[in-house]
């Protein structure tokens, strides 16, 4: 098996990213917020959406928003049929490595309550880092942090 994390670049990449987000993060009944494929945050300076591929098949998504030595991981999802099979940890490890490569020392995330256990197992800690973030899609999320480089 060949795994790769790639920044979203091509029209096919954008389509795959939107498909995964819509099916996993914005599934009917999950949020009252509708998905916006043209949300400006995906293309804002310092924000990079990524896809996790297995043998060229897109399986996961995450966006890394760089804020100096801090990175915020957003919109993390693994396709339904690959969940609970280690792909989330693989995506987490790839994002950590990419963040380190970019000079990020601390990662933060607004974790969905049902994902907190996953993040704890991956070495993250619960830490309130910006309560003003906990609105909209992040309402009800648990803020977490991980130091990835001393």
Feature roles, as predicted:
Residues 51, 57-65, 72-77:
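Conserved beta-strand in the GNAT
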Residues 82, 86-94:
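Conserved acetyl-CoA pyrophosphate-binding loop and the N-cap/start of the following alpha-helix
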Residues 92, 99-112:
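Conserved GNAT acetyl-CoA-binding A-motif
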Residues 110, 120, 125-144:
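Conserved catalytic-core motifs of GNAT/GCN5-like acyltransferases
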Residues 1-44, 49-57, 150:
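Short amphipathic alpha-helix that is part of the acyltransferase structural core
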Residues 91, 115-118:
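Conserved short alpha-helix immediately C-terminal to the canonical SAM/SAH-binding motif I
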Residues 74-75, 83, 117-121:
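Acidic/histidine-enriched, beta-strand-rich ligand/metal-binding domains
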């Amino acid at each position: 098996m060949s795994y790769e994390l790639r920044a979203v670049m091509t029209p096919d990449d954008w389509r795959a990213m939107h498909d995964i987000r819509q099916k996993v993060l914005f599934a009917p009944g999950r949020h009252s917020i509708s998905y916006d494929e043209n949300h400006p945050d995906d293309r804002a300076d310092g924000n990079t959406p990524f896809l996790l591929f297995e043998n060229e098949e897109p399986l996961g998504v995450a966006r890394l928003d760089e804020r100096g030595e801090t990175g915020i991981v957003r919109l993390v999802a693994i396709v339904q049929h690959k969940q609970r099979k280690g792909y989330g940890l693989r995506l987490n490890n790839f994002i950590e490595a990419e963040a380190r490569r970019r000079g990020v020392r601390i990662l933060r995330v607004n974790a969905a309550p049902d994902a907190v256990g996953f993040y704890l197992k991956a070495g993250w800690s619960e830490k309130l880092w910006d309560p003003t973030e906990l609105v909209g899609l992040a309402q009800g999320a648990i803020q977490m942090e991980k130091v990835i480089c001393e």
